[in-house]
């Protein structure tokens, strides 16, 4: 079996395993916020995900704990929402979020980078993406395992550039 097929099988198995569990967190938006984020400006996100995806529920808990309000849209297929925002297959992940201003946030992007983007959107930006499901990213925690990853900026003209590089587990959450 060639390396590409083996890699595809391993990636598919990881996605299925990560998304097949039901999240322990309630996915209903209760409107409650932790004390540490109560004073932050609350930002709404509409989250499109599979109804059975456990890692999506964990990511939703992460953004809610960081001061975002979420509206969950469970879908059997996410192809239509990804097509609507013209998210190329090489940037796709297991869930797509949309801000009230129409920017998309694809995959396991740490909340601090979404907030940074929304506080000062780059010119001609369409959205941000973390392709795949990097181990250790918010919602994809596996003990101490961490896989460095890039957050990509997609512009309205279709061009893609690196918005941020996340090289350690800690820098996903720290503002330094």
Regions found by a protein language model. Name each.
Residues 1-8:
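Bacterial N-terminal signal peptides that target proteins for export
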Residues 37-60, 64-66, 99:
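Local sequence-structure signature of Cys/Sec-based thiol-disulfide redox active-site neighborhoods
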Residues 58-68, 83-90, 103-104, 119-122:
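Sec-exported extracytoplasmic/periplasmic mature domains
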Residues 90-175:
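Thiol/selenol-based redox catalytic cores and closely related redox-interacting motifs
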Residues 20-23:
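Bacterial signal peptide processing site
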Residues 15-18:
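C-terminal motif of bacterial Sec signal peptides marking the signal peptidase cleavage site
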